[in-house]
């Protein structure tokens, strides 16, 4: 179903107001795939590299891409490790290398201002934005942590009940008594 939806999305993209370029970069015998949209009338725009969470694919981020474009920035939408077309598992301890491949790619494109690069991760993808804010601090100017897990979200004492009884149920029972 996912591959069918990607095919339909790319067919629909031919009719988008802002052209969408499918980017494929070689990566460890496979490829990383992203969607680039450029703002109208801006030369050498800054770039926002953005992605969703575990169940949010690059095809789901059109609304965010359109907001980025409104501010005169280029939108480069990708999948986080473990989702969509990203070939690397999110459990791979070195999964961050996919982001570094994208950061390197941006510098190969002369139409971007590679000195003004930001990242934006949503949901579980926010974890990667926060991590890049530290590990790529010399390469990026800003990072958006949009609705990501904090504190309990990474602790076994919370995760086990959340995955066995449902996060909302466990939270409601333990915090609010219902």
Regions found by a protein language model. Name each.
Residues 2-43:
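N-terminal cap/lid segment of alpha/beta-hydrolase-fold proteins
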Residues 111-123:
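Alpha/beta-hydrolase fold nucleophile elbow
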Residues 121-131:
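Glycine-rich nucleophile elbow surrounding the catalytic serine of serine-hydrolase chemistry
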Residues 79, 116-118, 142-144:
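Residue in the alpha/beta-hydrolase core beta-strand immediately N-terminal to the catalytic nucleophile
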Residues 134-178:
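Hydrolase active-site cap/lid region
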Residues 44-53:
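Short beta-strand element of the alpha/beta-hydrolase
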């Amino acid at each position: 179903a996912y591959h069918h939806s990607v095919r339909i999305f790319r067919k629909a993209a031919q009719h988008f107001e802002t052209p969408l370029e499918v980017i494929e970069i070689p990566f460890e015998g496979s490829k990383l795939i992203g969607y680039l949209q450029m703002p109208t009338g801006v030369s050498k725009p800054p770039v926002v590299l953005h992605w969703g969470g575990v169940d949010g694919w690059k095809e789901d981020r059109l609304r965010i891409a359109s907001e980025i474009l409104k501010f005169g920035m280029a939108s480069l939408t990708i999948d986080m490790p473990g989702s969509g077309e990203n070939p690397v598992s999110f459990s791979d301890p070195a999964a961050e290398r996919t982001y570094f491949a994208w950061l390197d790619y941006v510098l190969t494109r002369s139409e971007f201002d590679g000195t003004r690069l930001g990242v934006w991760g949503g949901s579980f993808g926010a974890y990667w934005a926060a991590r890049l804010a530290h590990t790529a601090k010399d390469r990026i100017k800003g990072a958006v942590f949009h609705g990501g897990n904090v504190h309990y979200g990474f602790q076994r004492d919370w995760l086990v009940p959340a995955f066995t009884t449902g996060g909302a149920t466990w939270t409601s029972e333990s915090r609010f008594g219902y």
